[in-house]
Amino acid sequence: MIQMQSRLDVADNTGARSVMCIKVLGGSKRRYAGIGDIIKVSVKDAAPRGRVKKGEVYSAVVVRTAKGVRRPDGSLVKFDSNAAVLLNNKLEPIGTRIFGPVTRELRGERFMKIVSLAPEVL
């Protein structure tokens, strides 16, 4: 459950280490984002020679949340932290590698590239 001002880890190799959610996309009154939702983020901490710089604004897709996601069989998949993958204007991942597991819920949407790059799909 991500809202404005939420800090997230970055699960790709773009050079960003942490980002802050500045907007949840998908309606003017939308308050929360879950796994698979697109948000606008500002880079808060970046590696010195990374592809992105501190202060830049990007779209991102949420790939892990501490709140978790409920499956139709009743199981709940939770993670230790919130994480996102940075996207370009065409909603394709900017990085070429994904770190850590992602959930199967990303497969049904338009993020097959992220699922194929991920080392583990839960």
From Swiss-Prot:
Pfam families: Ribosomal_L14. SUPFAM superfamilies: Ribosomal protein L14. The keyword Ribonucleoprotein applies. PROSITE patterns: RIBOSOMAL_L14 (PS00049). Keywords: Ribonucleoprotein, Ribosomal protein, RNA-binding, rRNA-binding. GO terms for cellular component: cytosolic large ribosomal subunit. GO terms for molecular function: large ribosomal subunit rRNA binding; structural constituent of ribosome. Coiled coil: none annotated. The keyword GTP-binding does not apply. GO terms for biological process: translation. PANTHER family: 50S/60S RIBOSOMAL PROTEIN L14/L23 (PTHR11761), LARGE RIBOSOMAL SUBUNIT PROTEIN UL14M (PTHR11761:SF3). HAMAP family: Ribosomal_uL14. NCBIfam families: rplN_bact. Binds to 23S rRNA. Forms part of two intersubunit bridges in the 70S ribosome. Part of the 50S ribosomal subunit. Forms a cluster with proteins L3 and L19. In the 70S ribosome, L14 and L19 interact and together make contacts with the 16S rRNA in bridges B5 and B8. Belongs to the universal ribosomal protein uL14 family. This is Large ribosomal subunit protein uL14. It comes from Methylobacillus flagellatus (strain ATCC 51484 / DSM 6875 / VKM B-1610 / KT). The gene is rplN.
